[in-house]
Amino acid sequence: MKTKLDFFKMKEQNEPIVMLTAYDYPSAKQAEKAEVDMILVGDSLGMVVLGLDSTIQVTIDDMIHHTKAVKRGAKDTFIVTDMPFMSYHYSLAETLKNAARIMQESGADALKLEGGDGVFESIQALTRGGIPVVSHLGLTPQSVGVLGGYKVQGKDHESAQKLIEDSLKCEEAGAIALVLECVPGELTKRITDMLKIPVIGIGAGAEADGQVLVYHDVVGYGVSRTPKFVKQYAQIDTLLEEALIQYTKEVKAHTFPEDKHTFHIKEEVLDGLYGGIKK
């Protein structure tokens, strides 16, 4: 399994880091088989697999449950788990307690925290406690209400400068990597060049040290629409729909199951059962 030092080395050698979300055992198993470098168990699972309206409703228990499943499917891949909404804002003591629980119960290798102001102390505290932290700046879904919706961040001078400053502060606080979401590519390059830690982009252009996308977006599974920055490499929904329709038709038509799908016992055994043929 790759470690923090491997990711730093990949940045130094200009080798792209591949990160992909996974929320359960089969998707994690497939991600590891594809040799991705990192798996993110994002709180996006709330919308993608739980059918919630936003990430705000996702709980610590949800994150632990799904991370445990992912860990079983990808034992040899570095796993980053999101700390969910308000689990690291009340106090440093509460933050440490929640983080320790997630790490101990889920098997995650690092935790991801969204935001800049108000989060730097949490990054420092977790780092001092021996918990690797991945920072997340730009479009931060847990704060989408404050940001005014799902919009590109850092397009004007003031907000771009703030992103640069916050990125440097995250690194200084001890973050081992930074996720930049929905940020202009030119700004991503500037930040990537300035930081020693790896920068992983999502909707942040090609100049980051790595890329992350949502598993379901990549394979076209259960998504009605995808953002501009997503490239779909398959349309699993179409295959699933065809398979399920065919299954329904065959059951209704009595063509499934066939004899090859059926187990049998010997006739004399059947005859000897209660209600069998009397001789």
Curated annotation (Swiss-Prot):
Similarity remark: Belongs to the PanB family.
Cofactor(s) required for function per UniProt: Mg(2+)
Free-text comment on the cofactor: Binds 1 Mg(2+) ion per subunit.
Subunit structure: Homodecamer; pentamer of dimers.
Gene Ontology CC entries for this record: cytoplasm
Residues noted as binding Mg(2+) in the record, renumbered to the chain: 43, 82, 114
Catalytic activity of the protein: 3-methyl-2-oxobutanoate + (6R)-5,10-methylene-5,6,7,8-tetrahydrofolate + H2O = 2-dehydropantoate + (6S)-5,6,7,8-tetrahydrofolate
Positions that bind 3-methyl-2-oxobutanoate: 43-44, 82, 112
Species whose genome carries this gene: Bacillus pumilus (strain SAFR-032)
Name of the protein this chain belongs to: 3-methyl-2-oxobutanoate hydroxymethyltransferase
GO biological process, any: pantothenate biosynthetic process
Subcellular location: Cytoplasm
Main location: cytoplasm
E.C. numbers: 2.1.2.11
Pfam family, one: Pantoate_transf
Function statement: Catalyzes the reversible reaction in which hydroxymethyl group from 5,10-methylenetetrahydrofolate is transferred onto alpha-ketoisovalerate to form ketopantoate.
MF annotations from Gene Ontology: 3-methyl-2-oxobutanoate hydroxymethyltransferase activity; magnesium ion binding
Pathways per UniProt: Cofactor biosynthesis; (R)-pantothenate biosynthesis; (R)-pantoate from 3-methyl-2-oxobutanoate: step 1/2
Record keywords: Cytoplasm, Magnesium, Metal-binding, Pantothenate biosynthesis, Transferase
Active site: 181 (proton acceptor)
